[in-house]
Each structure stands twice: as structure tokens, then as C-alpha cells.
Amino acid sequence: MILQTKHFGEIEINQEEIIRFPDGIPGFDDYTQYIFIENPDKEVPFHWLQAVEDGALAFVITNPFLFKPDYDFEISKNVVEKLSIEDQSDLQVYTIVRVPENIKEMTANLRAPLVINTKNKKGKQLMLDSEVYHTKHYILEEIQKMQEQSNQTSPAAEGGRD
């Protein structure tokens, strides 16, 4: 199947690669089929979730654990059943990223992660009831915190040998 997209031009997609969001993504309820487009630059942790029904609709997504390793939330039994999750290893978590002109203001929506069963290609955007996670987590700030924590726990920071 050929899909004409705004951001990637004409791409060929395999029906088996289509990820189905039965409930859509909030705000985009009419779009239930997406393709994961991996960034060809392996050094860059941002990818795309391209709508199949609308070539102009694509979300920038990333793995939240890359910048927020302690990210933690529960997946309800209802969602486990709806996505037919049999094993946690079949689950992939992403967050939608907002990329403004000033890259320092780039944010990730940690309050509403995307969970995808990679085995059967079913997905859902969760809405977490959390005071800890927000819709706009500044990614570069989170990375900076990780680096500071890493520097504090390194042997050199603890007075270890070089």
C-alpha cells in the first residue's frame, strides 16, 4: 500500500505494520490506524507515528525512559484486556513530543503515554491520574537532571581514582 504523506513524501507500508488504536488518540478520534516510522539516524531518539488515514497527520514520539528512567505507571486490567497484552515484553511505551521553534522548550506528554502491544499491533493512549506527570515535561531539563545525578554518583565525584 502506498501512502502519500506531508512529511515523508510517498511511502510504502505493509498492512501487517499498521498499529490500530481502536479508540483513536484523544483529539484525533477519527484516526485509528498508524505506522511507526523509525528515525534513520540511530543517534536521535525521536521517531514518528504517521496516520494512515491522513498523510498530513504525524506525531513526533520518543521512548520516555531515555530521559525519565524512573517513569512509572500502572496499566489497568481493562487496558491489558483491550490490547490483549499477554507478556510485558510485548509492550512498548512512547510519549508524544511537542517540538517548538526553540528546541530548548521541547516537551513530552508524560501524563498521556502511548502503549503499544508490538505482538498484535494494538495501541492506546492512556490518561494517567497523576500529580507527578504533566502534559509538558521539558525533555532537555530532564536530561540535564540525569547528567547531574550521574556526575554525583561517578567514582570521580565520590573521590575515586581517575
Swiss-Prot record:
CC terms in the record's Gene Ontology section: cytoplasm
UniProt keyword list: Bacterial flagellum biogenesis, Chaperone, Cytoplasm, Translation regulation
Stored InterPro entries: Flagellar_assembly_factor_FliW, Flagellar_assmbl_FliW_dom_sf
Cell compartments where the protein resides: Cytoplasm
One Gene Ontology biological process: bacterial-type flagellum assembly
A Pfam cross-reference name: FliW
Keyword Cytoplasm in annotation: yes
Xref: HAMAP family: FliW
Biological role: Acts as an anti-CsrA protein, binds CsrA and prevents it from repressing translation of its target genes, one of which is flagellin. Binds to flagellin and participates in the assembly of the flagellum.
Subunit structure: Interacts with translational regulator CsrA and flagellin(s).
Family according to the record: Belongs to the FliW family.
Protein name: Flagellar assembly factor FliW
